[in-house]
């Protein structure tokens, strides 16, 4: 009996951040264990502030990253935009995944930020830079993120993003229940 060979599918990740890339790889491999993927990280503009400060702006940043990734590499099977943001005293991220026919979206869990961090963000710094300054770390945003610091490494940026990405993949893992929406 011959084994069905599946064509490799290309996933373009609109980021060069290792934590984001690892989360995308992990989620796709978990959701589609029989599928072979080629993952490509690219840098594209979000067209929002470096540190989005509302839920709406953060969501728009993830959508824009997907749009710009499609323009940059128009022949991929999937495009993934991830955008972290802040609203009030919490930080979170939006995940947007698109194919030619479908879009899936999800927002990650939110975590409270310390008052000292929030006060320094008023100076328009990125959260990762402020966390490095307050906690004495270096480049935390490309490692475990603020969440690893605040949960004593019980959770990481990648682990939280992984869950949100699995949720954003629902239209793709359940195609019979989700008609084309693009």
Curated annotation (Swiss-Prot):
Protein EC: 3.6.1.73
Residues that span the membrane, as ranges: none
Cofactor names: Mg(2+); Mn(2+)
One function term, GO molecular function aspect: nucleotide binding
Cofactor binding mode and count: Binds 1 divalent metal cation per subunit; can use either Mg(2+) or Mn(2+).
Gene3D superfamilies: 3.90.950.10
Gene Ontology biological process terms from the UniProt entry: nucleotide metabolic process; thiamine metabolic process
Assembly and oligomerization: Homodimer.
Family per similarity comment: Belongs to the YjjX NTPase family.
UniProt-recorded name of the protein: Inosine/xanthosine triphosphatase
């Amino acid at each position: 009996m011959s084994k069905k060979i599946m064509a490799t599918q290309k996933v373009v990740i609109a980021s060069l951040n290792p934590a984001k890339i690892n989360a995308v790889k992990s989620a796709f491999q978990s959701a589609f264990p029989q599928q072979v993927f080629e993952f490509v990280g690219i840098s594209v503009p979000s067209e929002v502030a470096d540190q989005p400060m509302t839920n709406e702006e953060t969501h728009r940043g993830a959508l824009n990253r997907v749009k710009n990734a499609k323009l940059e590499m128009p022949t991929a099977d999937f495009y993934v935009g991830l955008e972290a943001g802040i609203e009030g005293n919490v930080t979170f991220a939006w995940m947007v995944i698109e194919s030619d026919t479908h879009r899936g979206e999800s927002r990650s869990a939110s975590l409270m930020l310390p008052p000292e961090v929030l006060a320094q963000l008023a100076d328009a710094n990125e959260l990762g830079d402020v966390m490095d300054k307050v906690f004495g770390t270096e480049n935390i945003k490309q490692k475990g993120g603020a969440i690893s610091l605040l949960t004593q490494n019980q959770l990481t940026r990648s682990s939280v993003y992984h869950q949100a990405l699995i949720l954003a993949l629902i239209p793709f893992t359940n195609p019979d229940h989700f008609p084309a929406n693009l």
